[in-house]
């Protein structure tokens, strides 16, 4: 089957309403892009929990609607334009064909083995490991965050490789796919816990961990609180985002044993000062490494009696 895309360039004020109207008029899907992408006028829009973007579209937006090839695209545009109070003649559009493809093969071709650090490979299931003697994780792109391709995941993996947690306990908070927990287990940790607020992430992590023959226990936060497991760890890793990390500073710091280490990522280089300040009452953090504008922060508690929180 083939499809036809309707491409419309509009001002920000009409982008969201026109997108909804195109869906109502019969489009199969609609996306909004920056019409100036790749030019000097490109306008980045991004956010994170507690810091959402103030605008839902770009000043100069491109609305792309996917339709069946046999549909009347002009009628769809006219109906959508009328719904948002525009004359059909005021909404210029172009059409482009989308041919049928082998989407499985196309998707697989976009994911090659990833080499991380000195000796870690993340390998999709349809590839062979380039170096079977390396630390190899078989991991397919899926529903949970974490395949090693993002700089923050890479930074945490490189830290773990540089500081092998042999015989130590490790907490991966915000575990996503379980990739960091699995690396810790393969590097010698004998007690690895992964925690995530998303049940789907826990499901994905369990699947990945079984596939990779690792020993990791995964919990939702409330489940961990009642698990009876020790609540402090030799190493705590959290690859989330700056704002949640700041909010969780007392809790995450309290999970670190005296003499233990805390590693944070999901932090932009421009956010180092504010994140470090949030943790300053509990632990001193410094930049361990930076990659593509993202950093890993690391710190160590002084040795002493355990005082972690439950």
Swiss-Prot record:
Pfam families: PrmA
Cell compartment(s), UniProt: Cytoplasm
InterPro entries, per the entry: Ribosomal_L11_MeTrfase_PrmA (IPR050078), Ribosomal_PrmA_MeTrfase (IPR004498), SAM-dependent_MTases_sf (IPR029063)
GO biological process entries: methylation
Superkingdom classification of source: Bacteria
Keyword entries, A-Z: Cytoplasm, Methyltransferase, S-adenosyl-L-methionine, Transferase
Entry's EC annotation: 2.1.1.-
GO molecular-function terms, A-Z: protein-lysine N-methyltransferase activity
Reaction equation(s) it catalyzes: L-lysyl-[protein] + 3 S-adenosyl-L-methionine = N(6),N(6),N(6)-trimethyl-L-lysyl-[protein] + 3 S-adenosyl-L-homocysteine + 3 H(+)
Primary location: cytoplasm
Sites where the protein binds S-adenosyl-L-methionine: 153, 174, 196, 239
A cellular component term, taken from the record's GO annotations: cytosol
PANTHER family assigned to the protein according to its UniProt record, in alphabetical order: ELECTRON TRANSFER FLAVOPROTEIN BETA SUBUNIT LYSINE METHYLTRANSFERASE
Protein task: Methylates ribosomal protein L11.
Family in the record: Belongs to the methyltransferase superfamily. PrmA family.
Protein name: Ribosomal protein L11 methyltransferase
Organism: Janthinobacterium sp. (strain Marseille)
Originating gene: prmA
């Amino acid at each position: 089957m083939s499809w036809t895309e309707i491409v419309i360039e509009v001002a920000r004020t009409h982008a969201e309403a026109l997108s909804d109207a195109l869906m109502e008029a019969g489009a199969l899907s609609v996306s909004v892009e920056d019409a100036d992408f790749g030019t000097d006028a490109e306008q980045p829009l991004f956010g994170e929990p507690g810091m959402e973007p103030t605008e839902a579209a770009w000043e100069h937006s491109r609305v792309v609607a996917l339709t069946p090839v046999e549909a009347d695209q002009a009628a769809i545009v006219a109906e959508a334009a009328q719904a948002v109070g525009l004359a059909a003649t005021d909404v210029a559009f172009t059409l482009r064909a989308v041919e049928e493809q082998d989407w499985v093969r196309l998707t697989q071709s976009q994911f090659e083995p990833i080499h991380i650090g000195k000796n870690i490979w993340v390998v999709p299931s349809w590839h062979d490991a380039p170096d079977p003697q390396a630390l190899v994780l078989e991991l397919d792109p899926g529903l949970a965050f974490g395949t090693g391709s993002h700089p923050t995941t890479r930074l945490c993996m490189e830290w773990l490789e540089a500081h092998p947690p042999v015989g130590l306990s490790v907490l991966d908070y915000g575990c996503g796919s379980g990739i960091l927990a699995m690396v810790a287990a393969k590097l010698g940790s004998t007690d690895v816990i992964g925690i995530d607020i998303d049940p789907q992430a826990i499901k994905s992590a369990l699947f990945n961990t079984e596939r990779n023959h690792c020993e990791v226990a995964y919990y939702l936060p409330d489940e961990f609180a009642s698990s009876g497991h020790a609540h402090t760890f030799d190493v705590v890793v959290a690859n989330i985002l700056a704002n949640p990390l700041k909010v969780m500073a007392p809790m995450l710091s309290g999970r670190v044993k005296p003499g233990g280490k805390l590693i944070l990522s999901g932090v932009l280089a421009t956010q180092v000062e504010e994140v470090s300040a949030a943790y300053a009452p509990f632990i001193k953090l410094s930049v361990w490494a930076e990659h593509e504008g993202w950093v890993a922060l690391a710190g160590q508690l002084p040795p002493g009696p355990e005082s972690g929180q439950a």
